[in-house]
Regions:
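Active-site helical microenvironments for divalent-metal-assisted chemistry
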Residues: 1-321
């Protein structure tokens, strides 16, 4: 699966998000209008994201995450391309998903705003999505995101797609800012993902869900933070370990009959490598960790994220493709 790293921690430029998707100028202009309108509605109530950023910062992230999930679903899960009207409607929902909840407007206001950009059918559908994503009343987040809330998402066409993009955006931002918040958002995803699984029979929503299932696992590796651990392996270590792992038929050694043989060979090599430089505390552990990382893409990406190896994906492909 191809991953497109999103590591910006400044105010996003609109065209940085959408230029890469080859939108027609007409579609780009409409999305720009939707974005500007949503930004102004949130600004009118003095709403900020994380206390300091214009709220459209978060809305851009949600739209960007939706587009990433969508394009990945098309490429890797055989999802069908959306027509321009449906795509525009979903981007409208991404930009307006918090307006009823936060901006003192109601369902029919959202529908009225949507009618500026597309026909009644799509305007109503966009309003339905935004309405379904509006929290219930409650004293805690768990109260507000109760079973009724997730049931509403599950039974509203395409709503789970936008909610998933919203959760991805929250997890990525909190991964940079607060590990506790990241864990809260991750646990929320784990608890709710099956509750909001689309019940409307739209295969596209299930394609998005399949992408998100894999993508969310990799967030800690794809978006490395500054608190990386020190890598104690030399280039020679990496080369030797990678060659051994490469003998294991693209790394899937754990499920192959010759696993014991490869593990024995690795153990002997690790002992030689360790004796070569005993003073490096923790090196033995990293050698073992790297070998296991070479066995499976997810482990490899996590290893690279942990130790700040930004070219991890390229290095993996170098040995296994």
């Amino acid at each position: 699966m191809d991953y497109e790293l999103y590591t910006k921690d400044e105010y996003l430029d609109f065209h940085d998000i959408f230029d890469k998707y080859n939108f027609s100028q007409e579609l780009l202009n409409k999305v720009d209008g939707i974005r500007s309108l949503a930004a102004s509605i949130h600004a009118e109530v003095n709403q900020y994201y994380d206390d300091s950023k214009p709220y459209v910062y978060h809305l851009d992230m949600v739209a960007d995450q939706f587009m990433y999930l969508y394009k990945t679903a098309v490429k890797h899960f055989e999802a069908k391309e959306l027509d321009d009207d449906t795509l525009l409607m979903l981007l409208f929902a991404a930009y307006f998903h918090d307006t009823i909840e936060d901006c003192r407007i109601h369902y029919y206001d959202v529908e009225k705003y949507a009618l500026r950009f597309f026909r009644k059918k799509y305007a109503t559908q966009a309003a339905e999505i935004v309405f379904s994503l509006t929290e219930e009343k409650g004293k805690t987040r768990a109260d507000r995101h109760n079973d009724k809330y997730y049931n509403g998402i599950a039974n509203t066409t395409y709503a789970s797609c936008i909610k998933t993009a919203d959760m991805c955006a929250n997890m990525i931002y909190s991964w940079y800012k607060s590990r506790k918040r990241y864990e809260d958002y991750y646990n929320e995803w784990t608890d709710c993902k099956m509750k909001m699984l689309d019940n409307t029979g739209i295969e596209f929503s299930h394609n998005i869900f399949c992408v998100a299932q894999e993508y969310i696992k990799f967030i800690p590796a794809l978006y490395p933070t500054l608190d990386k651990k020190e890598l104690l392996l030399s280039e020679e270590d990496v080369e030797n370990i990678s060659k051994i792992a490469g003998d294991c038929a693209s790394g899937n050694y754990l499920i192959r009959p010759r696993a014991d043989e490869y593990l024995k060979k690795f153990s002997e090599t690790m002992e030689i490598l360790s004796k070569a430089d005993d003073e490096k505390t923790g090196r033995d552990k990293q050698i073992t960790e790297y070998f296991y990382a070479c066995s499976e893409p997810k482990l490899f990406y996590l290893f690279c994220g942990k130790y700040g190896l930004k070219d991890g994906k390229d290095e993996y492909e170098r040995y296994y493709n």
